[in-house]
């Protein structure tokens, strides 16, 4: 539910009739709600380098997760499904492709297309997002360095 691309990239895509595929639409699983301040990451887990996953930022970002949980409970769905449904509702030229390392995530993520948000629900989400400050980055410079390969 990162909104930083709404200022320039998404309006440009819309104007030029270009589709947009958001990178990591569930913010590396953050929007799934399955991680908390006590979650321990090991080895080469990318979340070790993402400041959104440090304990104090997880706590500060709890209002976003609470909002998603409330809507998910009301719609008999998951926070991840609500996040994806919001994206699909908001832009008809957007195609989120969430990561799916487990079979059950496939059904869960595809199920987001069946969730219909009313205009009132959508507007409420937008209003709440306007009030929420997101702490920490979803992709930090360290991650960019990890994935960057320079052509020689």
Which residues are covered by each model-predicted region?
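Short coil/turn segments at secondary-structure boundaries
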Residues: 137-142
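Beta/alpha (TIM)-barrel catalytic core signal, keyed to glycine-rich beta->alpha loops juxtaposed to Asp/Glu
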Residues: 1-127, 146-152
